[in-house]
From Swiss-Prot:
GO biological process: L-histidine biosynthetic process
GO cellular component term of the entry, any: chloroplast
Protein known as: Histidinol-phosphate aminotransferase 1, chloroplastic
Cofactors, names only: pyridoxal 5'-phosphate
Transit peptide start and end: 1-40
Organism: Arabidopsis thaliana
A Pfam family hit: Aminotran_1_2
N-acetylalanine, modified sites: 41
Pathway: Amino-acid biosynthesis; L-histidine biosynthesis; L-histidine from 5-phospho-alpha-D-ribose 1-diphosphate: step 7/9
PTM annotation (N6-(pyridoxal phosphate)lysine): residues: 277
């Protein structure tokens, strides 16, 4: 790939973006110059409506994106309020694994006192990376901050994958991996999880050997079932010739130590984290990742320079300043998760799975339709998650909320039996 510099001379100068040396060569007259005006004479692949001689706008879109299915996001309070005809405070939102307690009070104070919102943010998020280094015990040079972990997932794919190269996905899991692979023109090899949602490590090894995929995306605790990846399984996969991206969005609720520090030992490991769950900052979009130094250099080059907003960095710094609040909220959500699990076990048409996260996956049994259950609960003002995928069409996922949220959910469920 290169840069074509068109000036006043009848030739193109091509500057390679892969070298610091300027390289140029003359091309075979793809245009003519008349009175210092340049007219392109090369053919175009753009589609034309011949009846009107108008180029159609979608003809400029990359072909593989024309078939892309849109990601199905969760709706915020203001949209749900309009759709359901209920005030936001009358909606129990248990569909997106959000932290219902919100961020520490220091966050609101810091946002209200922002000094320089009119100045571009620090491209390197230096203050936040230093704070994360203290929080994690990993030096800041291994840490990169993004506009949510979702941005980092896409950035990793853009830096690692050429179009047509493959990733391994282990469904059921976070659907953003398959979505971003499609956006980046990559192939996806699905290695389904075992019935207990553990990884099929032997099958992963076979696929790595036969298909030569570039990277594998793993979530621990896994979304949507809340299972964790054992250390033995992770070590076996790290021995394979594949880049391992470990998504620890929910690690705080698991009681398991983060593997962020492992990136100093394993050149093929990336660990992703987020402020959305732990600190209640889902709406401000702040995530971060730990990378081997041999990899992070290239992500620094390729990322958008001002990707983390001033508000996002200010809020994240303020959240980290009150570690006790973060721990207390985490403990409250874990307690409520365990209480919710016990109550859901008593519902005759639900089979809940044990979880190490802030949500519980439930199989909908006894002939009840999972999608209809989700829709009926929504009419009552209670939002839970249902999936359209083949693996999960008979399941719903319920986030752990405040005790009063659980109480409302259980009262609604009792109306079905």
């Amino acid at each position: 790939m290169g840069v074509i510099n068109v000036q006043g001379s009848p030739s193109f100068s091509i500057h390679s973006s892969e070298s610091n040396l300027r390289k140029s060569r003359a091309l075979k007259k793809p245009f003519c110059s008349i009175r210092n005006r340049v007219y392109c004479a090369q053919s175009s692949s753009a589609a034309v409506d011949e009846s009107k001689n108008i180029t159609m706008g979608d003809s400029f879109i990359r072909p593989h994106l024309r078939q892309l299915a849109a990601y199905q996001p969760i709706l915020p309070f203001e949209v749900l309020s309009a759709q359901l005809g209920r005030k936001p405070e009358d909606i129990v939102k248990l569909d997106a694994n959000e932290n219902p307690y919100g961020p520490p009070p220091e966050v609101f104070e810091a946002l209200g006192n922002m000094k320089f919102p009119y100045v571009y943010p620090d491209p390197q998020s230096r203050r936040l990376r230093d704070a994360l280094a203290q929080d994690s015990g990993l030096e800041s040079e291994y840490i990169l901050v993004g506009c949510g972990a979702d941005e980092l997932i896409d950035l990793i794919m853009r830096c690692v994958l050429d179009p047509g190269e493959k990733i391994i996905d282990c469904p059921p899991t976070f659907s953003m991996y398959v979505f971003d692979a499609a956006v980046n023109g990559a192939g996806v090899i699905k290695v389904p999880r075992n019935p207990d949602f553990s990884l099929n490590v032997d099958r992963i090894a076979e696929v790595v050997e036969l298909e030569k995929p570039k990277c594998i995306f793993l979530t621990s605790p896994n979304n949507p079932d809340g299972s964790i990846i054992s250390e033995d399984d992770l070590l076996k996969i790290l021995e394979m010739p594949i880049l391992v991206v470990l998504d620890e969005a929910y690690i705080e609720f698991s009681g398991v130590e983060s593997r962020m520090k492992w990136v100093k030992k394993y050149e093929n490991l990336i660990v992703l984290r987020t402020f959305s769950k732990r600190a209640g900052l889902a709406g401000l979009r702040v995530g971060y990742g730990a990378f081997p130094l041999s990899i992070i250099e290239y992500l620094w080059r390729a990322k958008q320079p001002y990707n983390v907003s001033v508000a996002g960095e200010v809020a994240a710094l303020a959240a980290l300043s009150n570690g006790k609040y973060l721990e207390d909220v985490r403990d409250a959500l874990v307690r409520e998760r365990e209480r919710l699990f016990g109550l859901l076990k008593e519902v005759p048409f639900l089979n809940p799975y044990p979880s190490y996260s802030n949500f519980i996956l439930c199989e909908v049994t006894s002939g009840m339709d999972a999608k209809k259950l989700k829709e009926d609960l929504a009419k009552m003002g209670v939002m839970v998650r249902h999936y359209n995928s083949q693996e999960l069409k008979g399941y719903v996922r319920v986030s752990a909320g405040k005790p009063e949220h659980t109480d409302v959910l259980m009262e609604c469920l009792k109306q079905f039996y």
